[in-house]
């Protein structure tokens, strides 16, 4: 299977006043496969507003298209998961993501943030109930269903940015699910996505002993 992609990207930053900054961009893409062409226009915009000296708000919107899909038929991650491209039958996955966050820098050398997001997806792929790729991947287009997905969550973070010891600690509460046509996968009812992680904690610490020696430690909980 041969495919070709042509893409272009442009962005610019705007400082409207001393408090308000804006970033706007767009990604244009043309993907050609099996005598079928898919064109996508993917705009993105982000804005930051400085409420007071130590408090800022940030919001963003991003539209994306993806020309490969991840297919897996097991409830756990396997090395045999398949990445498959779009075809004449299989459309690109498209998503719209919104985010809103607040940032506090009132303590010297520290930054605290809270950010929420919501992502809506369409043309997501899953194997039909009772079907898997084991044995052969031939004819996989007839073994899958296309549906909708969503992902949402909130992340809290504390970050130390100055001094010999730096790092950050974050906690994320999130949810990701899928929904297919009635009579299809799970009889059309929403169900958790395979890689749904409701709670996650990440800790990273770096310490610089001198100009030549530093050490870093990371820990993650899912």
Residue spans for each PLM region:
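Extracytoplasmic loops and strand-loop junctions of Gram-negative outer membrane beta-barrel proteins
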Residues: 1, 25-31, 79-87, 95-96, ...
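Short sequence motifs at beta-strands and strand-loop junctions characteristic
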Residues: 2-4, 16, 35-39, 89-94, ...
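Surface-exposed extracellular loop regions of Gram-negative outer-membrane beta-barrel proteins
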Residues: 2-35, 40-44, 49, 54-98, 118-141, 160-177, ...
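Hydrophobic, lipid-facing positions within transmembrane beta-strands of outer-membrane proteins
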Residues: 4-10, 26, 41-47, 96-100, ...
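Repeated loop/turn-to-beta-strand initiation elements of outer-membrane beta-barrel proteins
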Residues: 19-22, 54-57, 108-112, 164-169, ...
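Transmembrane beta-barrel strands of outer-membrane/channel proteins
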Residues: 24-30, 59-63, 81, 102, ...
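Gram-negative outer-membrane beta-barrel transporters
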Residues: 118-120, 138-222
